Structure formats: structure tokens, C-alpha cells
Regions:
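N-terminal and secondary-structure boundary signal
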Residues: 2-395
Length: 395
């Protein structure tokens, strides 16, 4: 029987109450404590081992995130990168080319929520005296998107950086070069997902030019998601059917979607992720990532630890860090530092710049990944209690 709207929200509220969540548009900022099981307490064996917490490979090193506040977007970005220059240079020297992943092709020409020309200029200002090129600049799309370079004004920036041998490209249109990821669909069946070649090329140094904004599926999006969701291959040229896009395989339900994003980050990050840059000069709140409203925040963040820069970004937005599933999975797998106590923030203090971002109207649904799956199958196998049956006839 189909659930009514009233029953749906009643169930969502019950899940939220059980987890101690606050779903009132504004939320607390402290991360929720990990779910643990008290010694001797009964728990559903379908939930797996009760001592899983101690086996997660949490990142044990300190990370550095620059947080700059100022009235010039370009300078904010540049200063954020200079502040972590000592961490960038060693990795940058080892790579053959840089790829700056912008954010904007799918924003239908709306500058809010997209990588601004001044943000790109700030990144190139930093690179110009430190890297001789080539530098590829671009975004991904679900079809031909070269018009984006002029649509968003990125092409006007290129003329000032001829030494970098700049080239714009749509990164996920090349059907002949890709990396293969095995994710899961809505029914938890394994599915192959093709990721664009640039995103799995060990010769590349990837810079994520993300934007501080809320999201309609994963609560918030910044540096990590900009690369993860830029990687899936688009349909072949001439095919405008979104169903044939690899990106669709990440939009397969709130649980599978978060998990597939984590899997993609786990595959790509060790290969070539260089710097996570987040432009928060004008953030987006409400129904992001494309239909939200502006927040005059006037900040920029950067780090070589993508998880850490997103963690600080969440704090600046006043969002509970335990809410984005893909980031929490990445932390549990040791992909970066997510513990604020182990992140050194240089520049402005978080408390000085923090704002409360209004979240997407569907945030209560997004948080259902945290609750129990209500359609779990019957217990089978080793976790099931042995039945008192006479099986001697089968011996």
C-alpha cells in the first residue's frame, strides 16, 4: 500500500527522533556521536558486528585548512592557496599537468553556485609563477558543453595566463578513456560506472574549484563532490538521453547515492587529487545546488586534504557534520581528516565567519540514510539462530 504524505513524515520524524536529530531548517553544528552498542545489549544481527567502530581506518594525521575572509573574491582564493603553499608544492612538482575542475556546466548559465571568473583567476594567479603548464581548465556535462567557457566568462580569464598553456575541455565526453568503478544501484545490485580519464590519470594534479552551497540530495556540496560528480562519463556525442549518462548511476536513492560517491572518492583521491578550493564569497542556501538563494559570506577555503576543507566548510555553514553521508563514509575509510580537533585552521577563525545556512526543503528525506532500512530481508546464514530441526535424514 502506498504511503500517505502524513505517514511518510511521521516515519521520518520517528527516525529523526530515534537518532536525536533536529529537523527545523536550522540545526546544531556539533557532530553526532558514533552509534555504539553497550556491552551485553541486544542488537539486530542484521546490523553487523557491534564493534565495527574500532576497525574504521580514521585518518590519524593533522591536516591544515586555510580560511580567508575579505572583500575581494580573487584575492581570497589566491591568499587561501598561498597560505598552504608549503603543502602544495611537493605534490605539484611530481605531476605533468594540472586540471582545474570548475563547477557550472549544468547550472543553465546561472552564476550563483558556479565557479566565478574571479575565482578561476585567483587559482591561476597562484599557479602562474609555480607551474609551467600545461593547465587544463573545464567542467563536465551530460552533453556537449563547450559553450560554458563563454557562458560563464571563463574564456575572458585565459588571455592573461599564456605561460600556463591553458586549454578548456569538457572532461567526461571522451568515451575511449575511462576508469571503471563498481557501485550499487537502488536494489543493491552491482553496477559498472565509467569515470572520465582525467580523473584517474596519475600524471594529473586535480584542483577542485568548488562553491559553498546546499544540496538537494547530500545536504551540502563543496570540494569532494565537485570532483566525484564531475567524473562520470556523459552520453556519447549526439546522444542527449540523460538515462545513458553514467552520472545517473549516482542518483539511485539516498543510500546507494551516498555510498557510490564515497566509492568514487576512494578510487580517485589517492591517484591525483591535489587541492580542494572552496569559494564562499557568495554561498548558496535553501534549495541548492541550482535553485537556492545567495549568502554574502565573503570567505575562501583551501586544503590538500579534501575531506578537511569540506569539514571546515560545513562548520562555516552551520551544518551538522554527521549529516552528509558520503563525507562520513570517506572519514571512516581514512580518506582524510574530519575531526575538527585535528584540523589546523589558518587565517580567519571559524567562529568569526560562521553563518547558519538555510537547508534544502527535503533535508529530512536526505537524512534517512542514517536510519534503519525498513525493508531488510529475513535473516539467513550464520547470523540466524539455529532451528531445532531433525536433519538426520539428510546426513
Amino acid at each position: 500500500m502506498l504511503a500517505t504524505r502524513r505517514s511518510f513524515f511521521a516515519r521520518a520524524a520517528a527516525i529523526a527522533t530515534a537518532q536525536g536529530l533536529v529537523l527545523k531548517g536550522q540545526q546544531t553544528t556539533a557532530p553526532a556521536a558514533p552509534v555504539t552498542h553497550a556491552p551485553g545489549k541486544q542488537y539486530d544481527p542484521r546490523m553487523g558486528t557491534s564493534n565495527a567502530e574500532k576497525y574504521f581506518k580514521y585518518y590519524d594525521r593533522r591536516s591544515k585548512v586555510s580560511l580567508i575572509k575579505g572583500d575581494n573574491r580573487r584575492k581570497n582564493i589566491y591568499d587561501a592557496l598561498v597560505a598552504i603553499d608549503d603543502q602544495i608544492r611537493p605534490a605539484l612538482k611530481a605531476k605533468k599537468y594540472v586540471f582545474v575542475k570548475l563547477n557550472g556546466v549544468e547550472a543553465a548559465g546561472r552564476l550563483l553556485g558556479s565557479t566565478q571568473p574571479d575565482a578561476l583567476a585567483g587559482i591561476l594567479d597562484y599557479l602562474a609563477p609555480r607551474f609551467k603548464g600545461p593547465v587544463f581548465v573545464g567542467d563536465s556535462g551530460d552533453g556537449p558543453g563547450n559553450k560554458a567557457v563563454s557562458q560563464f566568462g571563463w574564456d575572458k580569464v585565459f588571455a592573461d595566463y599564456k605561460s600556463l598553456k591553458l586549454k578548456f575541455e569538457i572532461t567526461n565526453e571522451d568515451q575511449s578513456h575511462y576508469g571503471l568503478l563498481y557501485g550499487i544501484d537502488y536494489d543493491l545490485h552491482v553496477i559498472p560506472i565509467r569515470l572520465g580519464g582525467r580523473f584517474v590519470d596519475p600524471d594529473a594534479f586535480l584542483i577542485s574549484a568548488g562553491v559553498l552551497k546546499t544540496h538537494n540530495m547530500v545536504v551540502a556540496t563543496m570540494a569532494v563532490k565537485n570532483l566525484v560528480m564531475g567524473a562520470p562519463l556523459a552520453p556519447a556525442l549526439g546522444n542527449s538521453n540523460y538515462a545513458d549518462s553514467e552520472k545517473r548511476k549516482f542518483h539511485v536513492g539516498i543510500r546507494s547515492g551516498n555510498y557510490n560517491m564515497f566509492l568514487a572518492a576512494q578510487k580517485m583521491l589517492p591517484i591525483n587529487w591535489g587541492i580542494g578550493v572552496v569559494d564562499g564569497y557568495e554561498g548558496m542556501e535553501g534549495n541548492g545546488p541550482m535553485s537556492g538563494t545567495p549568502v554574502g559570506h565573503r570567505i575562501a577555503l583551501a586544503s590538500t586534504d579534501f575531506l578537511a576543507v569540506d569539514r571546515v566548510g560545513l562548520e562555516c555553514m552551520g551544518i551538522d557534520a554527521s549529516w552528509p553521508g558520503y563525507l562520513n563514509y570517506a572519514y571512516q575509510a581514512g580518506l582524510g581528516q574530519y575531526d575538527l580537533k585535528k584540523i589546523d585552521v589558518v587565517g580567519a577563525k571559524i567562529a568569526e565567519v560562521q553563518k547558519k545556512y538555510r537547508l534544502h526543503a527535503d533535508v529530512d528525506r536526505m537524512l534517512e540514510w542514517r536510519g534503519p532500512m525498513l525493508d531488510l530481508p529475513s535473516n539467513l546464514g550464520r547470523n540466524r539462530r539455529r532451528e531445532d530441526q531433525d536433519i538426520s535424514a539428510y546426513a
